Amino acid sequence: MSAKPIYKRVLLKASGEALMGSQGFGIDVAVADRIASDIAEARAMGVEVGVVVGGGNIFRGVAVASKGGDRVTGDHMGMLATVINALALATSLRKLDIDTVVLSAIAMPEICESFSQRATLYHLSLGRVVIFAGGTGNPFFTTDSAAALRAAEMGAEAIFKGTQVDGIYSADPKKDPSATRFDRLTHSEILEKGLAVMDVAAVALARENAIPIVVFSIHEKGGFTEILTGGGRATIVTDN
């Protein structure tokens, strides 16, 4: 297999759950360091990388609504959780001497820069890893939707969705041993089959902008970079 990457610019989506590792809450620094190592390898290959991180390891906005609270406030709390995760991942990357910037959809200038497409493209042009925090900056949108949105804005050639398993299955393979794994799908098939890999808005936005989605296990060290060169194990979602 050639070590030459088949993608030049990608968006990596890492869930808060992934950063939690085997812990019940918070950030496992060893996991953050491992993900950072994979990103560093991608940068060494010349791939430009943007990252969207979730916040579910710290807080989920829907939890507030399920207890009778205000969903908007809950989502704002969830957005703040993504900022914490973004700063943690940025710290892990900087330990590897990877130039990294955090851009937040919610203005907090004392902590990180504010998001704009112009800032994103500028930092990418300088070879920096760009971590997007704060989701879309609006309630009622998931970080999957933020990933699709940022991928479109940065001109990403693919969205790499790091999950708990090595691709898209017909059902949760951890609960259903008979679940079937898909090697390739279209965006439309995901929507038609109701496959729970990303929310409907995210998949629709990726389809509209013809952005492939690559679903892989974020827990396999080196898996991200292996897939970047055309190998590895993943489900590839395209528009045809």
Swiss-Prot record:
Which pathway does this polypeptide act in? Pyrimidine metabolism; CTP biosynthesis via de novo pathway; UDP from UMP (UMPK route): step 1/1
List locations, semicolon-separated.
Answer: Cytoplasm
Q: Name one GO cellular component term.
A: cytosol
Q: Which residues bind ATP?
A: 13-16, 56, 60, 163-164, 169, 172
A Pfam family the protein falls into = AA_kinase
| CDD domains found in the cross-reference section | AAK_UMPK-PyrH-Ec (cd04254)
Keyword Nucleotide-binding among UniProt keywords: yes
Q: Which UniProt keywords apply?
A: Allosteric enzyme, ATP-binding, Cytoplasm, Kinase, Nucleotide-binding, Pyrimidine biosynthesis, Transferase
Which positions are annotated as binding UMP?
Answer: 55, 75, 136-143
**Coiled coil, from the record:** none
- Chain segments carrying region Involved in allosteric activation by GTP: 21-26
Top class in the EC scheme: transferase
EC numbers, comma separated: 2.7.4.22
Activity regulation, in the record's words, is: Allosterically activated by GTP. Inhibited by UTP.
According to its UniProt record, which reaction does this protein catalyse? Answer: UMP + ATP = UDP + ADP
Could you tell me the Gene Ontology terms of the biological process aspect for this record? Answer: 'de novo' CTP biosynthetic process; UDP biosynthetic process
GO MF annotation: an example? UMP kinase activity
On subunit structure and binding partners, the annotation says: Homohexamer.
According to its UniProt entry, what is the function of this protein?
A: Catalyzes the reversible phosphorylation of UMP to UDP.
Alphabetized NCBIfam families for the sequence: pyrH_bact
Per the similarity annotation, which family is this? Belongs to the UMP kinase family.
Query: What is the protein name stated in its UniProt record?
Result: Uridylate kinase
Q: Which organism is it from?
A: Rhizobium meliloti (strain 1021)
Q: The organism's lineage?
A: Bacteria, Pseudomonadati, Pseudomonadota, Alphaproteobacteria, Hyphomicrobiales
